[in-house]
């Protein structure tokens, strides 16, 4: 049987995600971000709610990406997620993209010329942002051109890099309906961005979201809920360079900007430069919020939920892979668990995220 991997955030889960799961074959394993997202923001609803939405709509097994995989630039996000799915035995990776290219060919190219390609990136001037360097590399070696608004295409290239040299086939699916950041309401498939913006519009949610009741009942948060906490972290920390990935230049800019910024958005605007993109600045602010430090990724894989089919697969994996289904005295990943505790501070009604939580079981799919 085919075992298909899907890397996702489901922030929140919508019809486009359901379409992706419907297109996937065989046993469907989702590696999903926890409570903080790749572009450096808190999830609108918590990881358990999002895992349940996925399981109700076609996923067989949902596992959690640790914090230091979730909140990373595309390449590291892709690498970390593919590592986890590879250990879970996937033979194909399905993903949505704005431009369906021959990603398999691109992966083969990277297998062959990876070292040379990385050297090319290292030699590019530091005035370029990391995404600009990556795009220059793909243009040079694969003749690829980019427009700035194809984040899924950028992630797809990161997945192509991550599967290079592994026995995993890539299956791109043409993204349906609205673009990634589109807030358009007159489409067949709305984007997650639009759903976050129109979260109080009942009709809109019902049109574009399969598990709408789950979403409506869940406690929701936005970045601004954490602004006082973020401000406190910045003001009270004498040396921000002790935080993961924060360099001297960024530390100075952030300390200066917090004197006048009245919101997270304003802070991001003030700190962003040509070299430091908004997404990168948001990630740095997320690291500061949760006081992230460089740390090893966890050995075990945290299971958020499964169907009967997923349970059978877990049984098969037992003994081959370290699986964590309950977090008790022994931590799974200290960094992720700390991030979860801080996530809970954004809304007092968010349920406990780790202790006493067991995987969600869905009997039928």
UniProtKB/Swiss-Prot annotation:
Gene3D superfamilies: HUPs. It is an enzyme of class 6 (ligase). It catalyses: cytidine(34) in elongator tRNA(Met) + acetate + ATP = N(4)-acetylcytidine(34) in elongator tRNA(Met) + AMP + diphosphate. ATP binds at residues 7-20, 96, 152, 175. It is found in: Cytoplasm. The keyword Ligase applies. It holds the Pfam family HIGH_NTase1. It comes from the Bacteria. Its EC number is 6.3.4.-. HAMAP family: TmcAL. Catalyzes the formation of N(4)-acetylcytidine (ac(4)C) at the wobble position of elongator tRNA(Met), using acetate and ATP as substrates. First activates an acetate ion to form acetyladenylate (Ac-AMP) and then transfers the acetyl group to tRNA to form ac(4)C34. Belongs to the TmcAL family. This is tRNA(Met) cytidine acetate ligase.
